[in-house]
């Protein structure tokens, strides 16, 4: 297999359980899998991208892709993502990053790609993976389309889901 491996549906379920009490990790996993965004786009999400001014969790995220400069995309969020956003993000400052780095609490910078990559590798260790180098932030991006393909064996459906990416 070329590139980084995606996670299986069972691996995602296991991680959701393992990460329940880790807000940042739970948010990264759920929103990362749902949105299929590149790490750079995912980490730049702000609270206002996922929560309305009145404090309600949005059911869709509006994102302009940084790398490709593509038009703004409207990406639906799953009940899992909505649940973790309600639990950990509602009430935060709308200008804060969803994935704020703990290394720079005063500058309020987002998590770096390097930090995100280390977190993904830590997850793989938690799952008992021996070769964590087969996984990266791109693994999270590829997971949803891989799960859809495994369930349907239909490339057209996967293409429709990932067409805008």
Predicted regions and their residues:
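Conserved catalytic core of the tyrosine transesterase superfamily
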Residues: 1-165
């Amino acid at each position: 297999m070329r590139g980084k491996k995606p996670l299986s549906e069972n691996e995602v379920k296991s991680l959701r359980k393992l990460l329940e009490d880790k807000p940042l990790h739970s948010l990264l996993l759920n929103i990362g899998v749902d949105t299929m965004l590149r790490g750079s786009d995912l980490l730049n999400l702000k609270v206002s991208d996922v929560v309305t001014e009145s404090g309600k969790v949005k059911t869709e995220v509006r994102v302009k892709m940084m790398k490709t400069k593509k038009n703004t995309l409207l990406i639906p969020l799953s009940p899992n993502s909505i649940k973790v956003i309600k639990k950990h993000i509602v009430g935060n400052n709308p200008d804060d990053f969803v994935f704020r780095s703990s290394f720079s609490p005063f500058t309020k910078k987002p998590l770096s790609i390097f930090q995100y990559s280390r977190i993904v590798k830590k997850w793989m260790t938690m799952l008992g993976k021996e070769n964590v180098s087969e996984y990266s932030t791109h693994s999270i991006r590829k997971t949803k389309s891989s799960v859809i393909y495994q369930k349907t064996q239909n490339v057209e459906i996967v293409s429709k889901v990932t067409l805008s990416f």
